[in-house]
């Protein structure tokens, strides 16, 4: 396998927005080069998780090695490295771009350039990749290739005179793409003599062999008898096997600079082989790791609780297993008086959170309650100390803190300009600060806002899509913390604080949200034998209150007629019982009530 010269290797990836046909195009390339036999072919071949196929998104990276005989009758090795297109996974994208020399920029010929595509194109340009524009879905009746070419030139500044028109569905233009990959993407640098360095661009957990690491050799070579060192985690391993993905794993003896492959070395967890880490040889280690490694930090937090308390050990076990294959997931145990035992989990973003939740429910058969998502707040205490908190119910009381700062993001929204008004309205409702508005083409516009992350993580994305009939797309990145007039809003049920419903809100919005919460709870909590007050409070001040009236048992039903003093005695006894009940009684809030309130539009 390794007698191929570096000049015959091409490493490339596909950059595309969700739904622009990236996975279908990858299927066609695998099929046309004969990498996957016709009978084994299934749609979205590289998307190995059911969830990926269903949602039509790529979550975990995959890689495939194809052999292609070009028109110059030379045989080339093409390594396709698949990338996720969603904003939550931008770090994963940046690393897979580092493993390539070129990229196919796939744009739907009926829809045009979208926000996440743009973000990834800029990442590719930063990594000096050769970009080949490809217009997909040209067979659709609504496709207008020339208009989209012009848009790519105006928005990204790429020359589209030699852009390729293709339809991954019908197979038109696939040959042209393969030829372009060979002729336009540069071959890897020939650094076989330098010290060995390889970049990890993906890893997954295999229950039998431990972590399988996908890597690209940047310089030097790796032999299956070598002992390797991972430079960021400082751990060393004996190799069990190395090989290539074609696209099923195939063992080889050695991989040289420029090649892409996998290795297994009985690595216990994905956290030991982090994406972006550098592999080198234990005996002759490289001096410097490859640049750009950073640990992915969670931005969104929420509590996960099993609906059935007996499932707590199962939840813990399944989170441990998930973390083996998802290094960005963080979790720690948490207890709540209302929900019992559960975990506080950190995610890269909302999509990541939904996917983890869905995988827990689907792959591990758990029934979960998820508390409202929150972000990391910076609390400035009176003694000038700063603390970071991701759980609103643990924020100190107003007397002991000076101010609360919250993370802000810079957001770019791309949309047809007829939706301008409604999008600007949405951003203003979410406390966004207008920065700029640019017309990309005569009918497409970019809105740039600075907006608190907490306002984005609830349901901003859904709102944006529904207000623009699905045409708008967005991408955002953190720009730092800012002070705001924020307060902790507590919900008290029968004078006891319900932790899962605690949230941090802006002072101006506190009354509206508090009012909504208590009204919703009043509908949902069943009546008890005594009166239950439900209150929303900021500190010690109650800002909204409702009460659920008591159920009344008719204690007089058995005295027909009879003496009035007998009736008074029974009523007095009942009143006394209710008073005792109110003091002793606990209100059992059904979990449906929590669920409904958490779904209540933020």
Swiss-Prot record:
Pfam families referenced in this protein's UniProt entry, alphabetically: EFG_C, GTP_EFTU, GTP_EFTU_D2, LepA_C
InterPro entries membership: EF-4, EFG_III/V, EFG_V-like, EFTu-like_2, G_TR_CS, GUFP, LepA_C_sf, LepA_CTD
GO biological process, one term: translation
PROSITE patterns xrefs: G_TR_1, G_TR_2
GO cellular component: plasma membrane
Enzyme class: hydrolase
Chemical reaction(s) catalysed: GTP + H2O = GDP + phosphate + H(+)
Cysteines engaged in disulfide bonds, as pairs: none
Keywords for the protein's UniProt record, in alphabetical order: Cell inner membrane, Cell membrane, GTP-binding, Hydrolase, Membrane, Nucleotide-binding, Protein biosynthesis
Location relative to the cell: Cell inner membrane
EC number(s) stated in the UniProt entry for this protein: 3.6.5.n1
Domain tr-type G: 7-196
Keyword Heme: no
Membrane-related topology note: Peripheral membrane protein
GO molecular function: GTP binding; GTPase activity; ribosome binding
Gene3D superfamilies named among the record's database cross-references: 3.30.70.240, Elongation factor 4, C-terminal domain (3.30.70.2570), Elongation Factor G (Translational Gtpase), domain 3 (3.30.70.870), P-loop containing nucleotide triphosphate hydrolases (3.40.50.300), Translation factors (2.40.30.10)
UniProt: GTP binding residues: 19-24, 136-139
General function of this protein: Required for accurate and efficient protein synthesis under certain stress conditions. May act as a fidelity factor of the translation reaction, by catalyzing a one-codon backward translocation of tRNAs on improperly translocated ribosomes. Back-translocation proceeds from a post-translocation (POST) complex to a pre-translocation (PRE) complex, thus giving elongation factor G a second chance to translocate the tRNAs correctly. Binds to ribosomes in a GTP-dependent manner.
Alphabetical list of NCBIfam families matching this protein: lepA, small_GTP
Family: Belongs to the TRAFAC class translation factor GTPase superfamily. Classic translation factor GTPase family. LepA subfamily.
PANTHER family in alphabetical order: TRANSLATION FACTOR GUF1 HOMOLOG, CHLOROPLASTIC, TRANSLATION FACTOR GUF1-RELATED
Name of this chain's protein: Elongation factor 4
Organism name: Prochlorococcus marinus (strain MIT 9515)
């Amino acid at each position: 396998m390794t007698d191929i010269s570096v000049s015959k290797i091409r490493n490339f990836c596909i950059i595309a927005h969700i739904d622009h046909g990236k996975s279908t195009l990858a299927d066609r390339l695998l099929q046309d080069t004969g990498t996957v036999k016709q009978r084994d072919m299934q749609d979205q071949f590289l998307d190995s998780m059911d969830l990926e196929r269903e949602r039509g998104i790529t979550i975990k990276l995959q890689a495939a090695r194809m052999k292609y005989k070009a028109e110059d009758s030379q045989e080339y090795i093409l390594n396709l490295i698949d990338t996720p297109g969603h904003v939550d996974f931008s770090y994963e994208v940046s690393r897979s771009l580092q493993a390539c020399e070129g990229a196919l920029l796939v744009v739907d010929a009926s829809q045009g350039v979208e926000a996440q595509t743009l973000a990834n194109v800029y990442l590719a340009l930063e990594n000096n990749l050769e970009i080949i524009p490809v217009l997909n879905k040209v067979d659709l009746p609504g496709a207008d290739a020339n208009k989209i070419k012009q848009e790519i030139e105006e928005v990204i500044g790429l020359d589209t005179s030699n852009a390729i028109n293709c339809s991954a569905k019908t197979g038109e233009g696939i040959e042209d793409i393969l030829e372009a990959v060979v002729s336009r993407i540069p071959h890897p640098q020939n650094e076989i003599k330098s010290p060995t360095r390889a970049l990890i661009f993906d890893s997954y957990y295999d229950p039998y062999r431990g972590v399988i690491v996908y890597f690209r050799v940047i310089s030097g070579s790796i032999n299956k008898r070598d002992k390797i060192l991972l430079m960021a985690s400082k751990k060393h391993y004996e190799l069990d096997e190395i090989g290539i993905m074609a696209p099923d794993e195939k063992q080889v003896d050695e991989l040289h600079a420029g090649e892409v492959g996998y290795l297994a070395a009985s690595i216990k967890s994905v956290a030991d082989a982090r994406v972006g880490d550098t592999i080198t040889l234990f005996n002759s280690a490289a001096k410097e790791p490859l640049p750009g490694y950073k640990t992915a930090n969670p931005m969104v937090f929420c509590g996960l609780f099993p609906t059935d308390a007996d499932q707590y050990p199962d939840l813990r076990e399944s989170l441990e297993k998930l973390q083996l294959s998802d290094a960005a997931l963080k979790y720690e145990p948490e207890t709540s008086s209302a929900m019992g035992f559960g975990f506080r989990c950190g995610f890269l973003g909302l999509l990541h959170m939904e996917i983890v939740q869905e995988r827990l429910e689907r792959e591990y058969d758990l029934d979960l309650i998820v508390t409202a998502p929150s972000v990391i707040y910076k609390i400035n205490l009176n003694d000038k100390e700063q603390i970071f908190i991701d759980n609103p119910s643990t924020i100190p009381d107003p007397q002991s803190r000076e101010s609360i700062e919250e993370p802000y993001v810079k957001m770019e929204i791309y949309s047809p300009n007829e939706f301008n008004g409604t999008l600007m309205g949405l951003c203003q409702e979410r406390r966004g600060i207008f920065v700029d508005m640019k017309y990309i083409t005569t009918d497409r516009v970019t809105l740039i806002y600075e907006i608190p992350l907490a306002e984005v993580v609830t349901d901003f994305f859904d709102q944006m899509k529904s207000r623009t009939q699905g045409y708008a797309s967005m991408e955002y990145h953190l720009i730092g913390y800012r002070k705001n007039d924020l307060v902790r809003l507590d919900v008290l049920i029968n004078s006891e604080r319900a932790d899962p419903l605690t949230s941090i809100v802006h002072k101006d919005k506190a009354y509206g949200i508090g009012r909504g919460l208590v009204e919703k709870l009043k509908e949902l909590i069943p009546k008890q034998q005594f009166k239950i007050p439900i209150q929303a409070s900021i500190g010690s001040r109650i800002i909204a209150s409702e009460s659920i009236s008591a159920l009344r048992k008719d204690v007089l039903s058995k005295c027909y007629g009879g003496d009035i003093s007998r009736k008074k005695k029974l009523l007095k006894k009942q009143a006394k019982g209710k008073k005792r009940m109110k003091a002793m009684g606990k209100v059992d809030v059904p979990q449906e009530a929590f669920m409904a309130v958490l779904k209540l539009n933020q």
